[in-house]
Regions:
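Transmembrane alpha-helix segments characteristic
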Residues: 232-247
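Extracytoplasmic catalytic/substrate-binding loops of multi-pass membrane glycan-assembly enzymes
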Residues: 6-19, 27-32, 179
Length: 247
């Protein structure tokens, strides 16, 4: 977090910003950064619990949702190290939560749009791949407004976009002044110039295999926990539609 700037060669600035805050408070104490990481993880769990509570109207199912999430490798084994992946977790959850509030309510409020824009910007400034979630959210609202017409377009939706862009401006200026070094670093890491056609088949398969292995504890927990509850799944359920798009 030393030498804070609006960007760095490898990642956007938010994870460094929070690290610097803890350094100013606690100094070079290792335990402080382990604590920082767990604060972010627990915050994500709290938001997920709140979201699940609004979705299921059941505190038990909300707790089960958090327990299942805890069973995923990236929410337990890798969390002692505070990095960009941990940094984005609460903002990912908060974006989903405020998207749900806008999706579920009949009335679009300034507050919900404003906070969605804020958390979307902070999440993106934690890690660029956060954009995948934001694209999913945009596709969801495009679908329900312009295709299915479940909801009417409201210009207040644009508040979230405006807030998002305004908060990104300093980082975009920094990128321009530094020859887009963060983006070029990410592209260089892909190894596209030295890869063969076969690599585009083999490595994705290896990646999928690793992800399947990582999710084994989650699947085991799901089997024992979810079978105790009865669910009625309807393809016309708007809650299911929301979850499909977001995931």
């Amino acid at each position: 977090g030393s030498n804070l700037d609006w960007g760095f060669n490898k990642h956007p600035p938010v994870s460094a910003f929070f690290s610097e805050i803890f350094f100013q408070i606690f100094g070079a104490q290792d335990w402080a950064y382990y604590l920082l990481s767990q604060i972010f993880v627990v915050t994500a769990f709290i938001v997920v619990f709140k979201f699940a509570e609004e979705l299921f109207k059941d505190k038990t199912l909300s707790l089960v949702s958090v327990l299942l999430l805890e069973g995923i490798y990236f929410y337990n084994f890798t969390t002692p190290e505070f990095n960009v992946n941990v940094c984005q977790l609460p903002f990912w959850a908060l974006c989903v939560y405020y998207s749900w509030k806008l999706f579920d309510k009949q009335q679009v409020t300034f507050k919900d749009c404003f906070w969605l824009g804020v958390f979307a910007a902070i999440g993106f400034l934690s890690k660029y791949l956060f954009i995948y979630l934001l694209i999913a959210i945009d596709l969801l609202f495009f679908y329900v407004i312009f295709i299915k017409k479940y909801k009417k377009f409201d210009f207040k939706y644009l508040i979230s976009l405006e807030v998002f862009i305004v908060l990104l401006v300093p980082h975009l200026i920094w990128l321009t002044n530094n020859d887009y070094i963060t983006i070029t670093y990410g592209l260089a890491r892909t190894g596209l110039e030295n890869s063969s056609f076969l690599d585009h088949i083999v490595y994705p398969l290896i990646f999928l295999g690793k992800q399947a292995g990582i999710l084994i504890p989650f699947f085991i927990m799901s089997f024992f926990l979810i079978k105790k509850f009865k669910f009625k799944i309807s393809l016309k359920d708007k809650k299911l539609l929301f979850l499909i798009f977001i995931n």
